From Swiss-Prot:
Free-text activity regulation comment from the record: Stimulated by phosphatidylinositol 4-phosphate (PtdIns4P). Slightly repressed by phosphatidyl-choline (PtdCho), wortmannin and adenosine.
Protein name in the entry: Phosphatidylinositol 4-kinase beta 1
UniProt-listed GO biological process terms: phosphatidylinositol phosphate biosynthetic process; pollen tube growth; root hair cell tip growth
Membrane protein topology class: Peripheral membrane protein
PROSITE patterns assigned: PI3_4_KINASE_1, PI3_4_KINASE_2, PI3_4_KINASE_3, PIK_HELICAL
Assembly with partners or alone: Interacts with AHK2, CBL1 and RABA4D.
InterPro entries linked: ARM-type_fold (IPR016024), Kinase-like_dom_sf (IPR011009), PI3/4_kinase_cat_dom (IPR000403), PI3/4_kinase_cat_sf (IPR036940), PI3/4_kinase_CS (IPR018936), PI3K_accessory_dom (IPR001263), PI4KB-PIK1_PIK (IPR049160), PI_Kinase (IPR015433)
Residue positions, PTM Phosphoserine: 449, 454
Region described as Activation loop: 988-1012
Subcellular location: Cell membrane; Golgi apparatus, trans-Golgi network; Cytoplasmic vesicle membrane
GO molecular function: 1-phosphatidylinositol 4-kinase activity; protein histidine kinase binding; small GTPase binding
Length: 1121
């Protein structure tokens, strides 16, 4: 199937990005093989992993452009899990489309923008081309702050949000008919809208609040390209009154009225139609309330019975010399805007200074001109409204004001109060060069020669015309206006300034224009965040200020934490180091309170959007380290007030053990049924968790378990459905074998009955029943289900023996260890870390001043400096993928992914795992416990249901981490890097040595994984590997896990291969690192051979001598028990 077009994203001009590449050139090739690739990208198989992997494998620009366009349709949570690889490819495999995509997603998520900044900062410190990385980093920063679409972390305290309104001032302008759109004379004492250039918000006399920047009020009056198209092709569209209430402001503003014969209504008549309406129907009775906006405005300058002739264009009428004969109008006929624009110089006029109108302050000019005006209007409008509109730039150069041309707003900190009042709204938008007035007049004169079209329609054709590249012939009106495209430079200049979609700087073209000019085309990036949130957004100026503040304050917060860890290294002794840590945290807390004013500080880790409010100084813990000073802190956070709809709707996925998925939405999507061959559909979609081949399952059963006994059929059971009448008759029969009945209601509401008949087997004899001493069942339950886990928990709560678990251990009897354990002050139910996380959380919440606020939560992190933790981030990312692989296969192998956030090449934030303790700390705290089994017996009470459940959790986690340690060659596995949680799971941390590097450069830990005597004792085995139920369960889980990982070998290998040129210590082996990783998956072996392979790996790891010697070395050198 040939591919028609490729979508491409170009770094140069955002107005043309994404653009269509109409020439196929050599993208597809002669064979057209890439056509299948495009179909694959458009299928249901497409996900984040496919996008990232093909971005790495395919260097062709067309493929990368198409992939980046498709990535816009993927959820941000999935993209975030591969952000490390994406940023790495940005630096080492640059692509304009990839740069554009990363810049765009930085504007959609604050957490992504922060992580991109830190990832690029780490690469910036290593790379030689610092200018290119710094330029991308700056663009991402601008996209996240000035053009950000993410909701601010908090709202300003002095802002009141009104539901159903996007802007309070616009809402007031549109809804207040009496104050703004009525020609009735207002009393002198009427309260008017006041405007102030202060950066805050202004309170009206009647109590309502208004933003300060006047330009911000009208910035949305700039029509978008879609509105321009609607004006050209939908000029006379009929709309109901109900639809007019539901439609947006600009549709109601720019829509034409229903008909000229109907009675005009102010709200239903379009703004520009009233602006351009000719005075053809002079005899028609038009009331004050039905007159057009500008018609009423200009009525004081024209004749009372006729405004102008219909043949004159708009601007010619606007620029007409007002020296003509004008009749003196009385006070009752004064128009509304005439009163608003009345010169404030004359103190003896009817309106006093306190009643200055809203628009009067908008259009007020600070310096009067010396233009000559008739005496009739000298007291009313000295300079004239139109002269203010088209005032030339010569006085603007004297008062240079900095304007944000991207979104049409003027920041309060860059303008003084006099400049705010000096420049009116229309003056700013219609500001032109000195020859603009002449050009506009010439254009209007030229338009008079076109008699077929009305002057107002030709005006729209000139104003809202489409760029030649974007022009599409869809109607005869557009084809007839081809001559208007090549209009005068003055109009083109005017329009470029008004809509700012062509002549922009490089920064504007890539960042500021992307928000306005993304066009929806088939296959192009979809606007996923178009759905409005429940709360109205902030005005853009305030929102961008808050976004900018939150972005920079979050960066400074993390930098202060990391610099604290870096500075504590030089402080001795340790007691002074703890004092210095608390003093530094106190200073950080002071900055936290100040950051609340500028937008808050984002907590960059975990799910959801939270802002940091406080760090309890007394809860900080300085961790043990000889050369560095890592520390652990608890952080009080509050959930952001305006979370995105996607984050609030996504429920947190939990595993069987209650651990959230590390990858979240990044799961591989299940293809539709039609994508599979017919003979494999049922096999793929079956719900069974065991997906091994039949031969593999038979091999495991033959090696691990005895044959099951033969079942004896004792009874025959038959079911039948009868009508209510016949069922009742049979129910009355005393000679009936009905044991139970249940009513059932059919579709016709006739009552039916289900008859259950149980009869004994006539051919059964007592000799047929076997002896009760039959071989045991397969109690190891090769793939335990969630139901089985719940059975164990329920049985443990009742104090009964759970089904499917052995009652006695097959290993050594450790009953004599019970008094020693009790003597070590460890009691059943004691917390491993001294205090359970929930208890600590409740205690801190009660003591905190923020604890009663909604959305309060407590997070714990480790701040580490002095180490390059990018390798640690890669290891945790790989563990997350192994976790997802086991979850997709339905295997009970247990892993605990955690987050490592790299903030530079030598600093990082690490998520702490609550309610855990290392084996070393457990032995140190309870000196009378000499082995890990002693701890299990003391904590869970031997042979109790909780003890069996803890053993099961230990085995499932041991199997998962054993496979990970073998495949990734994780070293340095001493007891300080092995944690235990409250449920008995074992957790591995600290992945500084993996793949090809080892401690000291000597591969002393040569065993596939750590399986020492004390670990085997917990599984009811010993150093010789004596069979036991839990040890057999461990073997089966290792076999199933290894076979499942082989199916996803390319997924793991490619993820590592993407970073092989990064210079991480784990890649010091060069290309052999990837080759050896591939060999460890043994992709050439059959599944039966893999069973024998895994069993041999377990045998070689049983209490290996080198593993024991390494533990002894750590005990002697570092005191690790």
């Amino acid at each position: 199937m040939p591919m028609g077009r490729f979508l491409s994203l170009v770094r140069g001009d955002s107005a043309e990005s994404p653009r269509e590449i109409t020439s196929q050139s050599n993208i597809i090739g002669d064979t057209g093989s890439n056509g299948w690739l495009i179909r694959f990208f458009d299928s249901a198989f497409f996900c984040e992993w496919i996008a990232v992997s093909y971005l790495y494998k395919h260097p062709h620009a067309g493929v990368r452009d198409y992939l980046c366009n498709r990535m816009y349709t993927l959820p941000l949570s999935g993209i975030e899990s591969y952000l490390f690889q994406i940023c790495y490819m940005m630096v080492h495999k640059p692509s304009p489309s990839l740069d554009k995509f990363v810049i765009d997603i930085c504007g959609k998520s604050l957490k992504i923008a922060l992580k991109v900044h830190w990832f690029l900062l780490a690469e910036l410190e290593d790379a030689d081309d610092n200018e290119g990385i710094s330029r991308i980093q700056e663009k991402c920063q601008i996209a996240a702050t000035l053009m950000g679409e993410w909701s601010p972390l908090m709202r300003p305290q002095n802002e009141v949000s009104t539901p159903g309104s996007k802007n309070q001032v616009l809402n007031r302008l549109l809804s207040s008919k009496q104050k703004l759109f009525s020609l009735k004379l207002s009393p002198p004492t009427q309260k008017s809208l006041s405007f102030s250039p202060s950066p805050g918000t202004n309170v009206q006399d009647d109590g309502s609040q208004l933003p300060a920047e006047d330009n911000k009020i009208f910035k949305k009056l700039i029509p978008s390209p879609k509105v321009r198209d609607a004006l050209m092709f939908r000029k006379s569209a009929d709309k109901d009154d109900e639809e007019s209430e539901k439609e947006g402001f600009f549709k109601r503003l720019l829509r034409d009225s229903k008909g000229e014969g109907d009675e005009p209504i102010p709200n239903s008549e379009g703004f520009f139609k009233r602006l351009l309406k000719d005075n053809k129907s002079e005899d028609e009775d038009i009331t004050n309330s039905s007159e057009g906006f500008f018609k009423r405005l200009l009525s004081s300058k024209g004749e009372s019975e006729e405004l102008t002739s219909s043949s004159d264009g708009l601007f010619k009428r606007l620029l007409r010399d007002n020296k003509g004969d004008e009749e003196e109008l009385g006070a009752n006929s004064d128009s509304f805007f005439k009163r608003l624009l009345r010169e404030s110089k004359n103190e003896d006029e009817e309106s006093n200074p306190n009643s200055e109108g809203f628009f009067k302050k908008l259009f007020r000019d600070s310096k009067p001109e010396d233009d000559k005006v008739p005496k009739e209007v000298d007291d009313e409008d000295k300079d004239g409204f139109l002269k203010k509109l088209f005032r030339e730039k010569n006085d603007d150069k004297r008062h240079g004001s900095e304007k944000n041309e991207a979104n049409g707003t003027v920041y309060a900190d860059k303008k003084s109060g006099e400049e705010d009042e000096r420049e009116g709204f229309f003056k700013k938008f219609f500001k032109e060069k000195s020859d603009d007035k002449k050009d506009i007049v010439k254009v209007d004169d030229g338009n008079e020669s076109e008699g077929d079209e009305s002057p107002e329609f030709s005006l729209f054709k000139r104003l809202f015309r489409i760029h030649p590249e974007d022009a599409k012939p869809t109607s005869e009106n557009e084809n007839s206006s081809n001559g208007l495209v090549e209009s005068s430079p003055g109009t083109e200049n005017f329009f470029r300034k008004l809509f700012r979609d062509r002549d922009q700087s490089v920064e504007d073209s890539e960042l500021f224009g992307s928000k306005k000019h993304k066009e929806k085309r088939p296959g192009s990036p979809k606007q996923r965040d178009d759905t409005p949130s429940g709360k109205p957004p902030l005005p853009n100026n305030t929102a961008s200020q808050f976004r900018k503040g939150a972005y920079h304050e979050s960066l400074e917060f993390v930098q202060a934490l990391c610099e604290t860890s870096y500075g504590l290294v030089d402080i001795f002794p340790i007691e002074d180091r703890k004092i210095g840590l608390r003093e530094s945290l106190a200073e950080i807390n002071f900055h936290l309170s100040e950051a609340e004013i500028t937008g808050g500080i984002c907590f960059p880790m975990g799910r959801g959007v939270f802002r940091v409010v406080h760090i309890p100084e007394d809860e900080c813990i300085l961790l043990n380290s000889r050369e560095k000073a890592p520390y652990m802190i608890s952080v009080e956070v509050l959930k952001a007030e305006t979370p995105s709809a996607k984050e609030s709707s996504n429920s947190q996925k939990l595993s069987k053990g209650g651990i959230p998925l590390a990858n979240g939405d990044a799961f591989l999507q299940k293809p539709p049924p039609w994508a599979y061959p017919l003979w494999t559909t049922q096999e793929v979609y079956r719900n069974s968790a065991d997906r091994m081949s039949l031969s593999t399952a038979q091999a495991i059963d033959q090696a691990m378990t005895p044959k099951s006994e033969v079942k004896v059929k004792l009874v025959n059971v038959s079911l039948s459905v009868e009508d209510r009448t016949s069922a009742l008759e049979s129910f009355g029969d005393p000679i009936d074998d009905v044991l139970g009945e249940a009513p059932r209601t059919g579709l016709n509401n006739d009552l039916e009955w289900v008859r259950v008949v149980v009869t004994a087997d006539p051919g059964l004899r007592m000799e047929s029943i076997p002896d009760p001493s039959v071989p045991r069942k397969k109690e190891h339950r090769r793939v335990p289900s969630t139901v089985a886990m719940e059975e164990v928990r329920a049985a443990a709560a009742k104090g009964e023996a759970p089904p499917g678990l052995p009652l006695k251990g097959a290993g050594q009897d450790s009953s004599d260890a019970q008094p020693r354990a009790n003597g070590g002050m460890l009691k059943e139910g004691d917390a491993l870390s001294g205090e359970l996380w929930e208890g600590k959380r409740d205690r801190i919440r009660k003591a905190s001043i923020y604890g009663k606020l909604p959305g309060w939560d407590l997070r714990s992190i480790i701040v580490k400096s002095g180490d390059d933790c990018r390798q640690e981030h890669l290891a945790v990312q790989l563990i997350s993928h192994f976790y997802d692989i086991f979850q997709e296969a339905g295997l009970p192998l247990w892993l605990r992914p955690y987050e490592v956030l790299v903030t530079s090449s030598y600093t990082a934030l690490i998520e702490t795992i609550p309610d855990t303790a290392s084996i070393h700390s457990i032995k140190s705290r309870y000196p009378n416990i000499t082995s890990l089994r002693d701890f299990f017996v003391a904590k869970y009470k031997e042979n109790s249901p909780s003890f069996k459940l803890a053993q099961r959790n230990f085995v499932e986690s041991m199997a998962g981490y054993s496979l990970v340690c073998y495949l990734l060659q994780v070293k340095d596995r001493h007891n300080g890097n092995l944690l235990l949680d409250e449920e008995g799971h074992i957790i591995h941390i600290d992945f500084g040595f993996m793949l090809s590097n080892s401690p000291g450069g000597v591969n002393f830990e040569s065993a596939p994984f750590k399986l020492t005597r004390e670990l085997l004792e917990v599984m009811d085995s010993d150093a010789d590997g004596v069979p036991s139920e839990f040890f057999d369960y461990f073997k089966v889980l290792c076999i199933q896990g290894f076979l499942t990982c082989r199916k996803h070998a390319e997924r793991i290998i490619l993820l590592v291969e993407m970073l092989q040129d990064s210079g991480f210590p784990c890649f010091k082996g060069g290309p052999r690192t990837i080759q050896n990783l591939r060999k460890r998956f043994h992709l050439s072996l059959t599944e039966e051979q893999c069973v024998s392979l895994v069993l041999s790996l377990i045998s070689s790891s049983l209490d290996a001598w080198r593993t024991r010697q390494y533990d002894y070395y750590q005990r002697v050198l570092n005191g690790i028990l």
